[in-house]
């Protein structure tokens, strides 16, 4: 069974949770006899080692662009990195030429998703769309920002959205996948006759159970003999590292041995510059470590998780929280802002801590319990580790293969 997977971005330099989840999904699909072929935009620097290619997957890259006039180079890079509604002419021809195609699976919305939908209809193959970042289950502030007219240039590509019916992605899809039960419920309410499936992300537990602390210590000697507080994720306003830096002076005053580690690529350069500027202030200087982006399943990342006294997730929006499962698998306590994804995994006070961003005192109380009661923290992490065992990569991929087979059979019966 050959399945074309459409991605709006696949950049090894900006590898984060979504890319990691997709990579693991492909590993599981291959183990279940599914042949995934990846379609994604070409990179400006084409010399980077592609983790999917290194794993033996076929990756077809196409030319893509942001159809907006008047953009600065920095703004254009930012839109390509996160959130930009890309367009491609190459992709149309490439998908037409794809042989033995059984399923079209888009992991992108907007014009890229619309192109995939259009070609799927023309080729009469089932169309599946996965929502990775949330559509309906978003904080009101983020929804409003999406609906605010862009003031960064003239978007001349609107016609392509109409031509490829990008607004009909959900209504015309054969199945909608989301990793979030709340998102699924909202989608089902809006599309009552549509097949909406909760498809969580999987975790290869053995990777996080293998001791990699020496790899982390060798790469980041600053963490030696420190209470490491790890925030793992791309540097981006949605991930909200700035909020954590606001709390950092209180943390450092109470826990002089603590070291805050921000691990992940920067996908929003203006925000990243704000973070770097803040780190030069006397109250934070030398107390916060920026690692930059690290490759998938890198021993240094695993080692950081294993060395951490706690994983802190201050995100404004988190539709799943893959890093929570990774932390638990590594035996690390979790403290997370109360977004819908983490709230579905973390039972407050049982296997982790949830806090509200507008009540920082609750965060500091949870952090105090984690650092001052290590036996309790270890017990909570152990409970989380048991939950993470339910997210087997192969089992979740087998579930998706079954959905593919059902859609193919239904399409055959309908014709």
Describe each region flagged by the PLM.
Residues 1-60, 395-398, 415:
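N-terminal subdomain of nucleotide-sugar transferases
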Residues 182, 202:
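Carbohydrate-associated surface elements
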Residues 209-222, 275:
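A short helix/loop element that forms part of the nucleotide-sugar donor recognition site in Leloir-type
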Residues 222-239, 245-248, 261-263:
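Conserved donor-binding/catalytic core segment of Leloir-type glycosyltransferases
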Residues 272-295:
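Nucleotide-activated donor-binding/catalytic signature segment of Leloir-type glycosyltransferases, i.e.
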Residues 316:
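Aromatic "clamp/platform" in nucleotide-sugar-dependent glycosyltransferases that forms part
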Residues 333-336:
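Short hydrophobic beta-strand element within catalytic cores of glycosyltransferases
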Residues 348-349, 353-360, 369-374:
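Conserved acidic donor-binding segment of nucleotide-sugar-dependent glycosyltransferases
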């Amino acid at each position: 069974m050959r399945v074309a997977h459409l991605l709006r971005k696949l950049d090894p330099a900006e590898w984060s949770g979504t890319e990691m989840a997709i990579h693991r999904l492909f590993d599981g699909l291959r183990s279940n006899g599914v042949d995934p072929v990846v379609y994604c935009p070409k990179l400006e620097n084409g010399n980077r080692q592609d983790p999917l290619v290194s794993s033996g997957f076929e990756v077809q890259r196409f030319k893509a662009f942001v159809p907006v006039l008047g953009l600065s180079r920095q703004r254009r890079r930012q839109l390509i990195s996160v959130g930009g509604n890309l367009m491609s002419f190459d992709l149309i021809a490439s998908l037409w030429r794809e042989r033995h195609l059984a399923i079209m699976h888009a992991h992108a919305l907007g014009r890229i998703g619309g192109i995939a939908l259009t070609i799927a209809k023309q080729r009469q193959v089932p169309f599946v769309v996965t929502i990775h970042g949330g559509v309906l289950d978003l904080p009101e502030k983020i929804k409003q920002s999406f609906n605010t007219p862009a003031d960064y240039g003239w978007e001349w590509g609107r016609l392509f959205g109409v031509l490829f019916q990008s607004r009909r992605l959900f209504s015309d899809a054969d199945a909608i996948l989301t990793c979030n039960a709340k998102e699924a419920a909202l989608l089902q309410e809006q599309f009552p006759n549509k097949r909406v499936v909760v498809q969580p992300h999987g975790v290869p537990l053995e990777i996080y159970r293998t001791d990699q602390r020496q790899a982390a210590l060798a790469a980041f000697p600053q963490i030696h003999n420190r209470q490491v507080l790890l925030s793992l994720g791309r540097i981006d306003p949605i991930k909200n590292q700035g909020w954590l830096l606001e709390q950092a002076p209180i943390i450092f005053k109470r826990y002089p041995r603590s070291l805050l580690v921000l691990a992940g690529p920067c996908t929003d350069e203006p925000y990243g510059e704000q973070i770097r500027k803040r780190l030069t202030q006397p109250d934070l200087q030398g107390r916060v470590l920026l690692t930059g982006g690290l490759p998938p399943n890198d021993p240094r990342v695993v080692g950081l998780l294993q060395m951490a006294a706690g994983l802190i997730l201050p995100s404004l929006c988190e539709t799943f929280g893959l890093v929570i499962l990774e932390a638990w698998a590594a035996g690390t306590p979790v403290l997370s802002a109360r977004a819908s994804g983490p709230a579905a995994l973390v039972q407050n006070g049982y296997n982790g801590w949830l806090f509200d961003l507008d009540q920082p005192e609750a965060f500091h109380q949870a952090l105090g319990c984690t650092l001052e009661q290590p036996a309790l923290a270890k017990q909570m992490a152990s409970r989380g580790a048991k939950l993470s065992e339910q997210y087997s990569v192969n089992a979740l991929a087998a579930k998706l293969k079954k959905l593919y087979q059902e859609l193919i059979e239904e399409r055959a019966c309908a014709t």
